[in-house]
Amino acid sequence: MTDLIKLTIAQSHKLLKERKLSSAELTRAHLDRIEKLEPEIKAFMTVCPESALAQAKAADEAIKQGHIRPLTGIPMALKDVLCTKGIRTTCSSRMLENFVPPYNAHVVDKLAEEGAVLLGKTNMDEFAMGSSTENSAFFTTHNPWNTAKVPGGSSGGSAACVAASEAVFSLGSDTGGSIRQPASFCSVTGLKPSYGMVSRYGLVAFASSLDQIGPFTKDVLDCALVMNAIAGFDDRDSTSVPQTAPDFSSCLDGDIKGFKLGVPKEYFSHNMRADIAEKINDALGVLSGLGASVDREVSLPHTPYALAVYYILAPSEASANLSRYDGVKYGYSYNQTENMWEAMEKTRAKGFGPEVKRRIMIGTYALSAGYYDAWYVKAQKVRTLISQEFNNAFEKYDALITPTTPNLPFSIGEKLSDPFEMYMCDTCTIPINIAGLPAISIPAGFVDGLPVGLQIIGKPFADQTIMRIAHAFQCATAWHKETPRL
């Protein structure tokens, strides 16, 4: 039989349905893989072998009774920013090191309804703030393609576990590129859905107007199958859009002849490596060969301001969202003083890591009385201009094509001393969050043995369009089938 850890969701489902494979066998194979590789990859914060095997047994019983859905019995992992009832949810922070939520996130319930098997929770940058997973308070995740390199962030553990075949799929969150950038660095498929497409209920908030939950998978078909399970309206999330989600897997069929694709010039900036740009040009050639028309002269002039806008708006929202961690209600509490104000101050000083404290201070400054108009209000105005530019572009184009990142996976420790250099890793992904658009990163080749990602951007709620283009690309190439030697 095919190596079980190499199977996609679709392949696993077929074998499970035909009773040629059991979920228990599939789950045990992935737990064995985790046990073997975790000392080197360090993708998981928490592994749940007993409950995973129990869920697999239940899935096998359901299949025996003829009750099987596309994700029934499929082993998966969750970024440790999604609440899981009875399983600790740390956000890779000392502040929540021992926090066990009393409820599940909406997407966790949806996957449970499907019968998916939860292997464990994955490592991340603390409170989803970072681009390398080095900001985890506990340990750094390593890139499966080169363990001296970072896997990207903040969802580095979720990307690495799929790339290393420790899970068939995983979920992450994306605030400024935290699904797409690690998907690029780890050579997997990663989708940031349209804002409001997937409920954020039970997602520990970083920046509420930017956060979105999405999948990491081995290919676009698997991505569509996961989206079929998690997308849709949820009245517990005020930003969830009240509309019926499409059948994403059925949208993949058909060619892309006649599709109009735009290539924004601003995404090939001075900090873009020439060899990455060359790989993207090769990918554009593939899309052109599939019948799409490619316009390389698109301009989105406000793109250079997106990074500054993001680092005003996101920290401002984080400053408000993280004010709840005061040591009083839950989480870490400094209890070596009887003075309440000192206890709160010490709780936050000791519970939060350096990057989280940096962003809280930036956000608090931007929201302060003397600077609110000069910084926060102005950033919101520029956000509107960026969104309008995208809207204008989508009147002419079906999708926009860019690199996912301007750089290759970098060495662990290389950028930690320079926060600005780290922030620059997300220049191609941040504008999409600012505008609330869907975007997908898919493997597009390698440079010096390290992965390069292709980003496909769509207009709001045209997630199925970008997935169709991505699927067509994967049908014409084999980059997504490459796996690291571990």
UniProtKB/Swiss-Prot annotation:
Alphabetical keyword list: ATP-binding, Ligase, Nucleotide-binding, Protein biosynthesis
Entries under SUPFAM superfamilies matching the protein: Amidase signature (AS) enzymes
GO CC entries: glutamyl-tRNA(Gln) amidotransferase complex
Signal peptide: none
EC number: 6.3.5.7
Subunit organization: Heterotrimer of A, B and C subunits.
Protein name: Glutamyl-tRNA(Gln) amidotransferase subunit A
